[in-house]
A protein has these predicted regions:
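Alpha-solenoid helical repeat scaffolds
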Residues: 216-217, 247-251, 280-285, 314-318, ...
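Transmembrane alpha-helices of multi-pass inner-membrane enzymes
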Residues: 1-5, 23-24, 120-123, 135-184
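Hydrophobic alpha-helical transmembrane segments in integral membrane proteins
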Residues: 31-48, 192-225
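Short coil turns that delineate tetratricopeptide repeat
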Residues: 243-244, 276-277, 310, 344
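Interfacial juxtamembrane loops and adjacent helix segments
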Residues: 67-110
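Internal/C-terminal transmembrane anchor helices
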Residues: 14-34, 181-206
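Membrane-interface helix-loop-helix junctions at transmembrane boundaries of multi-pass membrane enzymes
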Residues: 6, 10-18, 125-140, 261, ...
Length: 376
């Protein structure tokens, strides 16, 4: 109907309508460019994430990477992207390790494959268009929720995810649907009953997980006192409950590393790599490999960590020291120079200390001391 009205207006006053359309398009373009330049780093970061999201989807087109495995696949794909060729400096600086894809449709497609991606887009698009044509106000609500989902991660919040489902169902329901008998409405009536029946089991699992997270937060305080043996003891007890929590897996794997259980640490860290795009999992795994004498595996892990987020100094720092410790002096110097020439996104006391160590490494490539920890 809106299109028909615009067409009639164009037929009556074609020149005036054409000028108005061009002016509106130009104004919209200028506004978009202005917003982009006002928030350019954020916009470039979103564009890079959408690019990596799409690559994950295309690399796993049939069944996707599976629900819950998106972040790990994102980190691996971003590493492959930066390892393929020298990328623009701006892209390297905005690279990060997000927990979500900042586009729910692309993330859903990456987790479920192209079939799930097309089904979700088709269902949402059909519901929006149909509801707006029927003048169903829920169509506009669903459209707003879909636009929001294209630029953020609302489905990571359970109430917003449920809201999208409710809007989708309401938009698909005709406003003047005929009254149906009780028997025909029986499936809809049984739906909340089934939900109520499932609720106790779901709630119990959720409550157990929340309690385990609370206990781990208390135990984690011992990390500041370097009592990693306490973390290992409780980590083993809570591992079964929190095995899908990447933050727990990193803390537990790091505690195992600090207590010298390098093989067990790598098992836990490998599991965390499937759930997270944080390169610190690879950095600690590399230190475990080095302690076990597996220098080739340590080198591969550090190269992977650097490729995941190229503007971080820590992986190159560890790699230079690995080369120095294994007698590869020239490679140590080359890597140290590369690290010192790196344009850092964030500078800190830790990065300055590492740069000082790298300067010494250029003249003393066999330095053996290593930092205890580093967030960079």
């Amino acid at each position: 109907r809106i299109g028909g009205r615009l067409w009639l207006k164009y037929k009556r006053r074609p020149f005036h309508t054409g000028i108005s359309a061009v002016a509106a398009l130009a104004l919209t373009s200028l506004l978009a460019v202005g917003i982009y330049h006002a928030k350019r780093p954020s916009a470039d970061g979103r564009l890079l994430m959408w690019k990596i999201d799409s690559r994950v989807l295309l690399r796993h087109p049939l069944w996707g990477v599976g629900p819950g495995n998106f972040a790990g696949a994102f980190g691996r794909e971003q590493a492959a992207y930066f390892a393929e060729e020298e990328r623009p400096r701006q892209e390297q600086l905005v690279a990060g390790c997000p927990e979500s894809g900042f586009n729910e449709f692309l993330q859903f497609g990456a987790e479920t494959g192209i079939i799930g991606f097309v089904l979700l887009l088709s269902l949402t698009g059909t519901a929006v268009v149909g509801a707006i044509r029927r003048r169903n106000p829920f169509g506009y609500g669903l459209f707003g929720a879909a636009v929001f989902a294209c630029f953020s991660y609302p489905w990571s919040v359970l109430p917003l995810r449920l809201l999208f489902v409710v809007l989708l169902a309401a938009a698909c329901t005709p406003r003047n649907a005929p009254h149906r008998g009780l028997l025909r409405n029986l499936p809809l009536l049984l739906l909340p009953v089934a939900g109520a029946a499932c609720w106790p089991g779901l709630y119990d699992r959720y409550a157990v997980r929340v309690e385990a997270q609370r206990q781990w937060r208390e135990v984690r305080l011992w990390m500041h006192s370097e009592r990693y043996d306490y973390l290992v003891e409780d980590g083993e007890r809570l591992y079964g409950t929190l095995s899908e929590d990447f933050r727990f897996l990193y803390d537990y794997g790091y505690a195992l590393h600090k207590t010298g259980d390098y093989r067990r640490s790598n098992v836990v860290l490998q599991q965390g790599m499937q759930l997270s795009s944080d390169p610190m999992f690879h950095n600690i795994a590399a230190k475990n490999y080095e302690a076990l004498g597996a220098y080739d595996e340590a080198e591969r892990a550090l190269r992977q960590a650097h490729a995941m987020i190229p503007h971080r100094l820590y992986p190159l720092y560890l790699l230079a020291r690995l080369y120095a410790a294994t007698g590869r002096s020239e490679e140590a110097r080359t890597t140290a120079r590369r690290a010192l020439n790196l344009k850092l996104k964030v500078e800190s006391v830790q990065t300055r200390e590492m740069q000082e160590e790298l300067q010494k490494l250029l003249h003393e490539p066999t330095v053996q001391t290593q930092p205890e920890s580093c967030n960079e």
